[in-house]
Swiss-Prot record:
Cofactor note: Binds 2 magnesium or manganese ions per subunit.
Source organism of this protein record: Aeromonas salmonicida (strain A449)
Top-level taxonomy: Bacteria, Pseudomonadati, Pseudomonadota, Gammaproteobacteria, Aeromonadales
Binding site for Mg(2+) 2: 260, 262
Binding site for Mg(2+) 1: 248, 260
Name of protein: Probable alpha-L-glutamate ligase
Ranges of residues in domain ATP-grasp: 104-287
Length: 298
């Protein structure tokens, strides 16, 4: 196959691994800087241009779109889809998962376990919002935040009021969530590919920190997940419409709780911790998806 990878970082571990595996399996791969792609949105002949040239057709596209460029990145991916290029994850599914509030509402609607979560517009509702999630300590999350940025643990009622009001008054959209004390600063990242958990790791926050993101100094180790955790991860990815996803789960007294469903999960931490060839599983699935698309109707 001829595969395009949309990535702003060609030297990034995840991008390099996908290129290496795809080439080793005989595919032709080109890494395209998402923000350098530009589009001709014509009725009968839509096209994508890159560095002054019109791109030829690709059999498949792998989107590695960072959260900060979701709007433009999904627009580029839609253009590939308009040109009948098969996407590893669809633009619709990526947009759905990137809207954290919408994602939480969809997961809630389907009965997926979640931390108690509140959302409000007015500072007048802050006291009730704090009560709604069980009081302090609680967690405040910027809807646009990634990699643990914009996530604040408020340990007292007064601190919670101050932080929430400050965010609202500066026109930031936030979620307010209960703090799951029994998780002890750890979460589980499950890598789901084609409806199966192909690898999992436990991420532990460093001492004095509650955010377990590896970008924030957290550590990772292999973990054996329970059947309930496995089913939760698979179902969460399915609800988002993602064929490849990183599902973040907290272990709580009432069972697994989903924190987030990531449409462009990093591979370095989970491959190192689990010893699994996740990039290989992704390319194998891409081949399977292509064969299904090209299979003639009986």
């Amino acid at each position: 196959m001829k595969i395009a990878i949309l990535s702003r970082e060609p030297r990034n571990y995840s991008t390099r691994r996908l290129v290496e595996v795809a080439q080793a399996r005989g595919h032709q791969v080109e890494v395209l800087d998402t923000l350098r792609c530009y589009m001709n949105i014509a009725s009968h002949s839509p096209s994508i241009h890159y560095e002054g040239r019109e791109l030829e057709s690709y059999d498949a596209v792998i989107p590695r779109i960072g959260a900060s460029i979701t709007f433009y990145g999904t627009a580029v991916l839609r253009q590939f889809e308009m040109m009948n290029t098969m996407a590893l994850n669809s633009s619709v599914a990526i947009s759905r998962s990137r809207d954290k509030l919408r994602a939480m509402q969809l997961l809630s609607r389907h009965g997926i376990g979640l931390p108690i979560t509140g959302y409000a517009h007015s500072t007048h509702d802050v006291p009730d919002l704090i009560t709604m999630v069980g009081g302090a300590p609680l967690v405040v999350k910027l809807l646009e935040g990634t990699q643990g940025i914009g996530v604040v643990l408020c340990e007292t009622h007064k601190a919670a009021e101050s932080v929430i009001e400050a965010f609202i008054q500066t026109n930031n959209n936030i979620l307010v969530q209960e703090y799951i004390r029994e998780a002890n600063g750890a979460d589980i990242r499950c890598l789901v590919v084609n409806g199966k958990v192909v690898a999992a790791m436990r991420r532990q926050a460093q001492p004095g920190e509650f955010r377990s993101n590896l970008h924030r100094g957290g550590t990772a180790e292999a973990i054996k997940i329970s059947p309930e955790e496995r089913a939760t991860a698979v179902q969460a990815a399915k609800i988002m419409g993602l064929d490849v996803a990183g599902v973040d789960i907290l272990r709580s007294a009432r069972g697994p709780l989903v924190l987030e469903v990531n449409s462009s999960p990093g591979l370095q931490g989970v491959e190192a911790a689990s010893g699994k060839d996740v990039a290989g599983k992704i390319i194998e699935f891409l081949e399977l998806k292509a064969s299904r698309k090209n299979k003639p109707a009986e």
